[in-house]
Amino acid sequence: MRLAIVAGEASGDLLGASLIRALKRSVPDLQVEGVGGPLMRDAGCRCLHDADELAVMGIVEVLAELPRLLRLRRGLVKHWRDDPPNVFVGVDAPDFNLGLERKLRRKGIKTVQFVSPSVWAWRQRRVHKIARSTDLVLCLLPFEKAFYDRYDVPAVFVGHPLADEIPLYLDQSEHRRKLGLPENGQVIAVLPGSRRGELKRLGADFAGTIGWLASR
């Protein structure tokens, strides 16, 4: 069996790697190729392109990179049209993957979208594009399946892989000791995300805010 997969940025690489490992436990001889990062490579994916090539944020940046992204997508369509996989999985990155899925589906290739766009929160009309593009949506959140059921879009709730790795309840004192934090006092977690572009643009603002909070 041969799987094609495309993930953008670090979070998609993490999810894609967990999916590949899970599938290989059931299908040991599974062949995987596509777009991914170091975690997906370690899980056994032959990467045609690196996930960082899709990690573009901001209107100006996207417009500047649009010709390159369209060329990349056309190249993937041609590659998999000429040598079709059994299944294609798009991991998040809906602006890139849904268009790719639609083109591949027209060629008779089964397509899966892993991670639903936030259609339940905004731009709900995208659900019709999703219905045209994919044979199945793998949902991280339980209420997402109920949303797709209303539109007769096949969907399955699979949960988030990190839920299997991080306990629901943590010993606060133990983890404070591990992190070298005082037993008492307030702790604020700063989570800037995984996109390099966002870190580059907003890193100084995060650092300034942390310094301001620490001085209060």
Question: What role is predicted for each listed range?
Answer:
Residues R2-K178, L191-L199, W212:
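Active-site and donor-binding regions of nucleotide-sugar-utilizing enzymes
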